[in-house]
Each structure stands twice: as structure tokens, then as C-alpha cells.
Amino acid sequence: MTYPNLLDRFLTYVKVNTRSDEHSTTTPSTQSQVDFATNVLIPEMKRVGLQNVYYLPNGFAIGTLPANDPSLTRKIGFISHMDTADFNAEGVNPQVIENYDGCVIELGNSGFKLDPADFKSLEKYPGQTLITTDGTTLLGADDKSGIAEIMTAIEYLTAHPEIKHCEIRVGFGPDEEIGVGANKFDAEDFDVDFAYTVDGGPLGELQYETFSAAGAELHFQGRNVHPGTAKGQMVNALQLAIDFHNQLPENDRPELTEGYQGFYHLMDVTGSVEEARASYIIRDFEKDAFEARKASMQSIADKMNEELGSNRVTLNLTDQYYNMKEVIEKDMTPITIAKAVMEDLGITPIIEPIRGGTDGSKISFMGIPTPNIFAGGENMHGRFEYVSLQTMERAVDTIIGIVRSL
């Protein structure tokens, strides 16, 4: 089905810079997310028919579409995030490519291009309307496509009261991209039987397995002396960082893994001879493997300190989120419903693990099973991001279909 307001709604959203900031100590991490929620989303939530709309101190904009049939007693939620990834989001100037011809798309005057030779996903979209960047920013389809799709579905349900539905709760939250947005999610306030994040990628994605995730912060304390008299005295903190890294499995890196394979990912190294720091993320699907990875890093640090004769390597491990499969497999109802709806719509469900996480990874462990469905974005988190309008329309169809089926 086509939805006349979907494209304009999406274009309005992506033009607002809502980039999150991992170094911030506030919630949300950026004022722009607060402004987007209060000045753009909340007024529109009211316009499309949501009631009891409010903004919580945790950064979530919440609204309710009351049940229009008292016999439908379930309560369901739909959730998307407002923030965008750590890439330029100022001055987003989307291009709308109607009836895509399958050829190279020039991204404005930036010199960058979307070439099917480099991005095979483009081969799926001839004849469709694509929204791209101009090559200077990301697009923000992750996850403003999800917000636009949820908003459009609510608008449609409000305009069609003949579609009987249970109570629907909507939540638009902050800081998903930096992994902290759902930390303060109020599950008791949201109060639904189950929910869906609309935060997936291509058509048909239906996901209930995520990584379990941890962060590792390492501090290496060296001892700097003049290199001319360094023998037996100098301890080079940068060399300690190298030595630590070289003891991790050589092939357990993101660029060498896929499917259910986990990894260690070195994100950042800074320092000098005197002092160095390194940041890693740790990812795996199975709980035992996840715990083993953390234990391995601690073992390396302990071994190095023993060999050095002092505690020059300090490791701080922080769990970030866990594989929501552990929760959702106890009751697969949300998956069964979404899968059946997609199949009825002629969409082939793609049920595979997310090599990442969603807000649902945390919300599921708060007592609300929250799998993830597609929102349409491709090549997310950078200048090559794009989305198909037709896929977005199918996401709206899926949301409405889920509501109809309850």
C-alpha cells in the first residue's frame, strides 16, 4: 500500500541533526535529541491520533492508541530510536531518486557515488524510489525510517476505525547508537505484553538473536627514560599495548568473521611511552563463549603483570547488553505473529542473527520481549546509506498487519 505522508515525514525527520555523543554524561546525550522529541515528534504524535503523549526524563517520547474493541485485551508496543550514528549529520540533504534505473547514483557534487559494482544491494531496487545522501552526511534511515513507519501506521489506524485493534503503545527513544538509550527505559510505565523495535535493515528482516556485548578499557603504565640509557629501565606503554593485542586470536576480528562468529574489536589506541590506553568491544552470541572472551582478556592482563613484576596493565570490563534470544525463546509468540503477517503480505521473512544489538536487547531483559523488524535502510551509518520508499511502505504494512492479527 502507498501512504501519502510517509516520504515527506521521513525527509522532515532526517534533516534534523540528532547525532548522539558517546562522551556525554547526560541523558539524552545531545540536546538535539531532546529538541527533536519535544518540538517535532510529540506534536506529530498527537496529530496522528496518539493519546496520553508525554516525554520522560529518560529521553523517551511515549504515546498510546487506545483499543477500539474492548474484547482485544492484549497490549503491544512499537519502538524506534531518534539518534543517528557517529558520522556527520549536520545539513542532511537527501536525494530522492524516482524509478531507479539500476545505474550509478552520483551523491550530489561530493564526488562519491553509489555504484552497483560496489553495493550489490542496489540490484534489488530497479524501478523503486530511493532516498540517498548527497555524499556529505549520513542519511539517518537508521532509525528515522522506523519512526516514520510507526507514525504512518498509527495515522492509518486512526483514519480507519473499522480496523479493530488492541491498545498500542509507541516509544521513540535516544542514544541507541551509543548503546545506552534503553538503560533507563521504564518497562513498568510502557506496560505491554510484547513489543517490536522497527530498526532493521532490508525487506523481511525479523530478528530475535543479538550479540552479547561488553566493552574493555585498558590502561598501560610505562616508564619513560632517555632512549640512550633505556636498556633495563624503560617500559614502553605503547609496546605493552601491542603485546597485549598480539595475544588475542588473530582471526577473531570483525573483518574476518560472520554469522555466529564472535570477535574482539580494537576501537581506539592512544598514548605515549609513559602511558597508553586501548578500547575494545567484545561480541559473541553464546553466553559461555562471551564469558570466555572476557576471561581470556583478563588472563592476558594478569599474565603480563606477572611477567612484568608489577601491575602495569589494568583492564576494566563492562557488560553492555545480552542476547535477547534467551528471553524471546521462552515464548515465540511475537516471532510467530510477525512471520505469519509477512508471509501473508508476500514478504519472505529473513530470520537471522543481528551482528549487533538493538534497544530490544535490553528491553527484553526488563520483561518485555522485543524482537526487531525491518525498517528498510541499507549501508547504514555513513555517506552511502540509502532506503527504498517501497520497502518503507511494506514496513508500514507489516506494522498494521501485526496490529490486525492480535
Swiss-Prot record:
Obligatory cofactor(s): Zn(2+)
GO cellular component term of the entry, any: cytosol
Residues reported to bind Zn(2+) 2: 142, 177, 381
Binding site for Zn(2+) 1: 81, 142, 199
Keywords recorded for this protein, A-Z: Aminopeptidase, Cytoplasm, Hydrolase, Metal-binding, Metalloprotease, Protease, Zinc
A UniProt-annotated Pfam family: Peptidase_M20
Catalytic activity field: Release of the N-terminal residue from a tripeptide
Subcellular location as annotated: Cytoplasm
Keyword Protease: yes
Catalytic residues (UniProt): 83, 176
GO molecular function term, any single one: tripeptide aminopeptidase activity
Top EC group: hydrolase
Cofactor note: Binds 2 Zn(2+) ions per subunit.
EC number annotated for this UniProt entry: 3.4.11.4
GO biological process entries: peptide catabolic process; proteolysis
Xref: InterPro entries: ArgE/DapE_CS, Bact_exopeptidase_dim_dom, Peptidase_M20, Peptidase_M20_dimer, Peptidase_M20B
UniProt function note: Cleaves the N-terminal amino acid of tripeptides.
Family affiliation: Belongs to the peptidase M20B family.
Name the record gives this protein: Peptidase T
Species name: Streptococcus pneumoniae serotype 2 (strain D39 / NCTC 7466)
